[in-house]
Amino acid sequence: MVRPLGEIDISKNNLRRVDSLSTLREEALHMHKVHQGKLETVSKVKVENAKDLSLAYSPGVAEPCKEIYDDKSKVYEYTMKGNMVAVVTDGTAVLGLGNIGPEASLPVMEGKAVLFKSFAGVDAFPIALNTNDVDKIVETVKLMEPTFGGVNLEDIAAPNCFIIEERLKKETNIPIFHDDQHGTAIVTVAGLVNALKLVGKKMSDIKVVANGAGAAGIAIIKLLYRYGVRDIIMCDRKGAIYDGRPTGMNPVKDEVAKYTNKNRIEGSLADVVQGADVFIGVSAEGALTEEMVRTMNDDAIIFAMANPVPEIMPELAKAAGAAVVGTGRSDFANQVNNVLAFPGIFRGALDVHATQINEEMKMAAVQAIAELVAEDELNADYIIPAPFDARVAPQVAAYVAKAAMETGVARRQVDPNEIAEKTKQLALIGKE
């Protein structure tokens, strides 16, 4: 079991933020150094005498070995596999830091493992690979399949992240989930479901413009399409993406271009965002201006998720006419935080011994998150549950497990209510 334990502007207006950042840096370095990381291995059983030793190791350990040899599915009953996820990275696309390599990415992977344990009781182990070679990464993960019940791919740069995930989904029989893609997409769409209720619009009627064609942006567009959004334009650094664009394309963009921007509109973000109902940003600071927001449709919805500084600050977006604004930051309302998704998704998938995390399971997670915001509580500053809402992971786990069973990818049938209750008991958050 694994247990959780740039240049700065110093003008007058930013002194408080600088002090905060300096303090955060010092506290973070101290915390990581004093504990020598955030994880340690702890035994579930005591070994205090000869009898304990004979059960935990030789000769008693031979008995579960023989059981598993006769029936490999029993590995889920007799070992940690049924509750163990590998958090795999090559360190090429670490949020806010970029390509920093495997060693420097390890604190992030440890942190991810802490969140798995804290929010849903899932044991997770960080694995930072010293290669960017797709074939080597795929082969390495495949070789680890006997040990892990699932794999969370993390901070792997596009387009490799797409290729690696697709290959592993085809070549393994355990859940493979690239959280940078799907976690962000699930929480974003859950927020949009509720935001549309507020402004009285339907998925089938809206125009969505997304800025940023990396892992998260592509996944958001794909999930929105499954939800019935048909008027979608995606932009990257070269402007609007369309079928047949001669430059700046790759196979993933080519695929998306076949079902988005049907009129093959060219131009910049400023050109295509005019008349849009929704802006989704997974790009860069300041990409969306107040003037652009003013050209959008009435009751515009803005998800500005660039970190640490969003595409537009919430107060500026609202002043320009936006009805609802979400960001990736905890100091603003409507934080789009992946922790609302991935712990519960893996909890549900593991508990039914799922062979994959399919589209229906992702959509079930969207529904689970969105439904936690009651109609009488829904408002412009509350469209997404808070990250520490203890109801989230249990509901997501139950909904995801149910979807897995209904779509035939579960190897075990379990009452979803039991899974929800188990998640409540295992989670470390929400306890007195």
Task: Tell where the protein language model's regions lie, with residue ranges.
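Solvent-exposed alpha-helices and their adjacent loops that cap or buttress functional pockets
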Residues: 76-81, 117-118, 143-145, 169-170, ...
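Adenosine-phosphate binding glycine-rich loop
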Residues: 179-180, 199, 304-414
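Short, ordered loop/turn segments at secondary-structure junctions
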Residues: 90-92, 100, 129-130, 155-158, ...
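N-terminal ligand-binding/catalytic initiation module
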Residues: 3-176, 403, 407-411, 429-432
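General beta-strand structural signal in soluble alpha/beta enzymes
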Residues: 126, 152-155, 176-179, 210, ...
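Rossmann-like adenosine-cofactor binding region
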Residues: 253-323, 329-331
